[in-house]
Amino acid sequence: MRRASVIALAAAGPLAVALLRLVLPYYSSTGNREAAAAVAANGAAESLVLWLGFIAVLTLAPGLYAIRDRMPAGRLRTTAFTLATIGYLCLPGLLAVDLLLWVGTNQGLPVATVAELADGVHPSAMVAMGLFVPTHILGIVLIGTLALRSRLLPRTVAWMLIISQPLHLASVLSGLPTLDFVAWSSTALGMAWLAATLPPVERMGHDDSAVLAHANGG
């Protein structure tokens, strides 16, 4: 895969989520009734959320895979990418609620009925939500930590990647969509920087592997 393609793939998913979090019409809602009312007032934004979510589903996990084998092997890499992948693969479960909100509103159902549909989402979606939060946050923190320890990124960029997802969590708890956009954009920048910095797998020879192993303390 060409370097430009790897960079684009690594950044596409987090950037799609950054935009999604910025335009989400019910960002500060405290329940599904408020969320349904917000979607009813701005159905176009919710439609955009679903399209951005679709892009994220298609690109988040492949973006991880595109850079995984370019990074130093070891338990830290295995743990980091496993957690991040599990989290990203749970994303469709979160979008299930958005789909219900959009469909119900688009069909002209009352806000109360749409809220009841969202409240009745299948338990698997709730499990996905429960898994998504800790796994993707910890996974990205560990990827940033690996990049910092291995000196694969400038320290400032590595720390930006490390704190990006805890910052996302803080923005959700504080109801600050602009800060959330910054957080996910920081993840996108860190991942793209990694993709631009790391040597292509197919071109890595003995010397390249030795450099990475040495950087990782091997």
Place the predicted regions along the sequence by residue.
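Hydrophobic, aromatic-enriched alpha-helical segments typical of multi-pass transmembrane helices
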Residues: 1-218
